């Protein structure tokens, strides 16, 4: 701070090579300091973004590991990435966030995330099998959509090999 004054943070973030003007700071050390500062600043901005949208700040570190500086852009592009098990985000919070960002109620990403959430929810409650009509009805109720929209989402998930539908005891599940 004594060397660069009020522009210290700007130098640290945007002109790290100038840090070598300080005795004892090598180019390598200057790069490391700058990278650390940018990472911490990025996480801080991400936490501010998450909390402004009523999402838990604990998501910030995992999001930053996956997306880096592009984390907020990734969330704006597809908020349902948070429904990936890696993030452990509550579906209702993610869904409210997505709708806040003007994602359409019948958006394919929302429908598919809702189906996968219902499957995960049932599995966590000990159900290893759910008849397709029951899955579609439960997801339709969760998302407040018609079952035809859910069935179309289910078909997309199977075509993408993200889900397997099988017939057991005469029931598609």
Where do the PLM segments sit?
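Accessory alpha-helical DNA-binding modules that contact the DNA backbone or grooves
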Residues: 1-170
């Amino acid at each position: 701070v004594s060397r660069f004054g009020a522009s210290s943070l700007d130098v640290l973030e945007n002109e790290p090579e100038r840090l070598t003007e300080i005795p004892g700071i090598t180019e390598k050390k200057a790069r490391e300091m700058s990278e650390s500062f940018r990472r911490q600043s990025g996480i801080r901005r991400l936490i501010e973004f998450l909390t402004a949208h009523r999402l838990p700040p604990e998501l910030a570190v995992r999001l930053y590991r996956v997306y880096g500086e592009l984390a907020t852009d990734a969330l704006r592009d597809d908020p349902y990435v948070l429904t990936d098990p890696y993030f452990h985000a509550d579906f209702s919070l993610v869904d409210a966030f997505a709708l806040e960002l003007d994602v359409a109620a019948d958006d394919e990403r929302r429908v598919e995330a809702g189906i996968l959430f219902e499957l995960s929810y049932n599995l966590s409650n000990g159900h290893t099998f759910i008849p397709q009509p029951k899955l579609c009805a439960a997801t339709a109720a969760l998302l407040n959509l018609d079952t035809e929209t859910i069935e179309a989402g289910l078909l997309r998930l199977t075509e993408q090999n993200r889900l397997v539908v099988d017939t057991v005891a005469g029931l598609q599940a």
